[in-house]
Amino acid sequence: MQCYQASCHCGAIKFSFEAEPFKSGVRCNCSYCSKRGTMISLVPGEKFKFDAQEGALGTYQWGRMQAKHHFCKNCGVSTFSETTRRPGQYIVNLGCVDGVDTFALEVTMFDGKHLL
């Protein structure tokens, strides 16, 4: 396991977690992910911590309300999500994670358009 640090663009939201080194990331084609264009990964929640400046953390939900998609209200960056489908885990935007080059990772496609 490796400790990772992450943040939104303006730094108002910071988060850290432990995970295995990233070799791949996921691209989802659901209606939300296809619009935000992020590469994501599921990480264990045991050591996930976040800190946000007051009023900076926004949350978006829609449809069946199964997921909470968190973003920075200052810079607009999608940071991480929580879902009832994966309790105790977080879905992180790998573009926010320090030292992770998303262009160097293998891409796994998730057909959220049909499976969610």
Regions inferred by a protein language model and the residue ranges of each:
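A short Gly-Trp-Pro
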Residues: 1-7, 12-116
